[in-house]
Amino acid sequence: MRCPFCGSEDTQVKDSRPAEDNTSIRRRRICPDCGGRFTTYERVQLRELMVIKKSGRKLPFDREKLVRSFEIALRKRPVDRDRIERAVSGIARRLESSGETEIPSEEIGLQVLEALKSLDDVAFVRYASVYRDFSHAEDFENVIAEINAKIARDTDAGA
């Protein structure tokens, strides 16, 4: 693995351990040339996924972009990083096991919305406002009414 600090190709693994519910390996590495230390993650990739954008353009699936989407929606919200990682891993696993190699971006967006709905209502509304292209206050009101109806159904079911 190339050192991100000096570019040396000769790095050494100092520690390896399972991470993210045993779906990846976390490796601590050190560069003998510059002494730099860094962490890498190794994940199983079942197939190379391509995302089909609304414009028709195809891009490789980027797990880190998915993580950033969650982080933006959840900014300043009380949700642990581990819960974000589990949600992202679940989405990536479902996409990889779907049998499809080309996934519409809309499908990924729907899965993110579903995950955010169970993580944090505020983050769900934030993401929905961008994903569904809200342009009026009524759009927010409709989503909030949808959340309130779900809460009422859950409360009635638990009573």
From Swiss-Prot:
- Enumerate the residue ranges forming zinc fingers (unnamed): 3-34
Q: According to the lineage, what is the superkingdom?
A: Bacteria
Q: Where is this region: Disordered?
A: 1-22
What's a single GO BP term from this record? negative regulation of DNA-templated transcription
Q: Where is the composition biased (Basic and acidic residues)?
A: 11-22
What keywords would UniProt list here?
ATP-binding, DNA-binding, Metal-binding, Nucleotide-binding, Repressor, Transcription, Transcription regulation, Zinc, Zinc-finger
Co-factor(s): Zn(2+)
- Pfam families assigned: ATP-cone (PF03477), Zn_ribbon_NrdR (PF22811)
All copies of the ATP-cone domain together span 49-139
Q: How is the cofactor bound?
A: Binds 1 zinc ion.
Q: Name one GO molecular function term.
A: ATP binding
**Its family?**
Belongs to the NrdR family.
Q: What does this protein do?
A: Negatively regulates transcription of bacterial ribonucleotide reductase nrd genes and operons by binding to NrdR-boxes.
Please give the name of this protein: Transcriptional repressor NrdR
